[in-house]
Swiss-Prot record:
Domains as described in the record: The J-like region, although related to the J domain does not have co-chaperone activity.
InterPro entries: J_dom_sf, Tim16
Record text on subunit structure and interactions: Probable component of the PAM complex at least composed of a mitochondrial HSP70 protein, Roe1, TIM44, blp/TIM16 and TIM14. Associates with the TIM23 complex.
GO annotation (BP), single: instar larval development
Gene that this sequence comes from: blp
Annotated membrane topology: Peripheral membrane protein
Protein name: Mitochondrial import inner membrane translocase subunit Tim16
Naturally occurring in which organism (per UniProt): Drosophila melanogaster
Superkingdom of this protein's organism: Eukaryota
UniProt record similarity statement: Belongs to the TIM16/PAM16 family.
Region (J-like): 60-113
Length: 141
């Protein structure tokens, strides 16, 4: 009798171990996929932060505002204003949809700002290195 109980315990532990291993592998794969989608590194961190702040991904925002190029500010503004006005509550629109439109524009604005900041920091870094090299050449003289 004890032999059968021991076998049941061993088989149960093996089944639980296999299930745990499979779940762990799936979690690792999902984590790697999420990191790949986010872009990884600092850019991925900024993208994830924007997603959390607005509660919406860049793809969702582009779909809501019917935008192909997230850098086209004129199209974003035009579509945002149209959709926001069409969904006014006083005109029988939906506050929920109106808030989604607002969040989509907010998410796209974050994306535009994120693309502008690295450019300005790159030019500042280039200026800093130029100034450093000039000061070094002056010190050598």
């Amino acid at each position: 009798m004890a032999k059968y109980i021991a076998q049941i315990i061993v088989l149960g532990a093996q089944a639980v171990g296999r299930a745990f291993t499979k779940a762990l592998r799936q979690e690792i794969a999902a984590s790697q996929e999420a990191a790949r989608r986010a872009g990884g590194g600092k850019q991925g961190d900024k993208s994830a932060e924007s997603n959390l702040r607005t509660g919406m991904t860049l793809e969702e925002a582009k779909q809501i505002l019917n935008i192909d190029d997230p850098k086209n500010v004129d199209a974003i503004t035009k579509n945002y204003e149209h959709l926001f006005q069409v969904n006014e509550r006083s005109k029988g629109g939906s506050f929920y949809i109106q808030s989604k439109v607002f969040r989509a524009k907010e998410r796209l604005d974050h994306e535009i700002k994120a693309h502008e900041q690295p450019r300005s920091s790159n030019t500042e870094a280039a200026q800093d290195t130029a100034e450093e090299s000039q000061s070094r050449s002056r010190q050598r003289r």
